[in-house]
Curated annotation (Swiss-Prot):
One Gene Ontology term from the biological process aspect of the record: response to oxidative stress
The species this protein was found in: Caenorhabditis elegans
Keyword set includes Metal-binding: yes
Residue ranges of coiled coil: none
Keywords recorded for this protein, A-Z: Metal-binding, Oxidoreductase, Zinc
Source superkingdom: Eukaryota
Catalytic center residues: 140
Amino acids binding Zn(2+): 66, 69, 116, 119
Role summary: Methionine-sulfoxide reductase that specifically reduces methionine (R)-sulfoxide back to methionine. While in many cases, methionine oxidation is the result of random oxidation following oxidative stress, methionine oxidation is also a post-translational modification that takes place on specific residue.
Protein name, per record: Probable methionine-R-sulfoxide reductase B
Reaction catalysis annotation: L-methionyl-[protein] + [thioredoxin]-disulfide + H2O = L-methionyl-(R)-S-oxide-[protein] + [thioredoxin]-dithiol
Family annotation (InterPro entries): Met_Sox_Rdtase_MsrB, Met_Sox_Rdtase_MsrB_dom, Mss4-like_sf
GO CC, alphabetical: cytoplasm
Top class in the EC scheme: oxidoreductase
Length: 152
């Protein structure tokens, strides 16, 4: 089963009744505006099931933004097929302008987690096994954490 491809109008922050700094939004507020699976992955640091994300096989031209707050994360030009089960990107927008990297030693592994710098949503992980002809990095991102805006 493939999950929905979220669009700009699905961004959670835009559904709140008041304007707020995304870091000041309470978990109960996020839970009230985000679908259950998005909340579980983005706000509770979960992982969507591999090969089920709506953007795994999605290669239209445009940009990907954080589904919680709308911050720009990736351009479609950086997307590539990695076969890992999640959307893969070789670089983020503005050299991690809207992304924070955090050492993740959970589940007996040593990885680098990536989170949204604006709202602290868990996005996925970045690995050093990406295309050598670009950055050598592979951002492995949960589809449910992103919305897509098509480029005309």
């Amino acid at each position: 089963m493939t999950t929905k491809k979220f669009r700009m109008e699905d961004v959670g922050l835009s559904k709140l009744k008041v304007e707020k700094n995304p870091k000041d939004v309470k978990q109960t507020e996020w839970k009230s505006v985000l679908p259950n699976e998005v909340y579980r992955v983005a706000r509770e640091s979960g992982t969507e099931t591999p090969h089920t994300g709506g953007f795994n096989d999605h290669f239209e031209k445009g940009r990907y933004v954080c589904l919680c707050c709308g911050s720009e994360l990736f351009n479609s030009d950086a997307k590539f097929w990695a076969g890992c089960g999640w959307p893969a990107f070789s670089e983020s927008v503005g050299q991690d302008a809207n992304i924070v990297r955090i050492v993740d030693r959970s589940h007996g592994m040593h990885r680098t987690e990536v989170r949204c710098k604006t709202c602290d949503a868990h996005l996925g992980h970045v690995f050093n096994d990406g295309p050598k002809e670009t950055t050598g990095e592979r951002y492995c991102i949960n589809s449910v954490c992103m919305a897509f805006e098509k480029k005309d």
